[in-house]
């Protein structure tokens, strides 16, 4: 049994507080894009085995998809073993939820495969034990995510918007970025409610001009190349560009496929991980 595990971008990311346990309270708009891993799950006699086409991806308990299989087996007392194969296309440590979306895919497949058939809401609660992005990845589409990311409210779909996605040649630790984030230094917060109403109006110009990610305050300061990529995408004719999640990936929206194609070709001369895709 296999499914596509889609990457996500943030249309906005606001930090509104901090819990006693150190987790930040967020208000963010998440959006799936047509860039995906293919996650295959099969029954085997015992244990958990994981294989991936990218050698740098861990295939043991460090892998979130492996952890997802283990959690599901333990929660629902599954005796059968599990074989997971991941065809990885989403860059890792990129701010695109590559690990979370694979974990979500494993939970969704196992729920069907073993006829457990828990509700999406229950599956999302289980996914939260693996990471804050996993509940959204189970739900998908266009959504407002609050709390630490676990409170997911579906929004009107914001589909078929063209974007170019560029990841610089390094990864970023989400944990480290949040650790360095200082809420007291924030002056302007994202206009989340206005962004939501303009998603409903399908207003790509407003979205592109007003999308905001507070984690840029940390990551852009550490890596000048991210600002450079944003500028390069804008020069190519993007309606606007922004870093996704904790970074370092940058995306830009385009209203014209020809401009996007030219931008893709230009970026591909300098960077390895470049994609031309759409919102879904």
Curated annotation (Swiss-Prot):
SUPFAM superfamilies: GHMP Kinase, C-terminal domain, Ribosomal protein S5 domain 2-like
Active-site residues, as the UniProt record annotates them: 8, 133
Ligand binding (ATP): 91-101
GO molecular function terms noted in the UniProt entry: 4-(cytidine 5'-diphospho)-2-C-methyl-D-erythritol kinase activity; ATP binding
EC number: 2.7.1.148
InterPro entries with a match to the protein in the record: GHMP_kinase_C_dom, GHMP_kinase_C_sf, GHMP_kinase_N_dom, IspE, Ribosomal_Su5_D2-typ_SF, Ribsml_uS5_D2-typ_fold_subgr
Alphabetized UniProt keyword annotations: ATP-binding, Isoprene biosynthesis, Kinase, Nucleotide-binding, Transferase
Short name of one Pfam family: GHMP_kinases_N
Any one biological process term the GO annotation gives: isopentenyl diphosphate biosynthetic process, methylerythritol 4-phosphate pathway
Highest taxon of source: Bacteria
Enzymatic class: transferase
Entry-linked HAMAP family: IspE (MF_00061)
Protein's UniProt name: 4-diphosphocytidyl-2-C-methyl-D-erythritol kinase
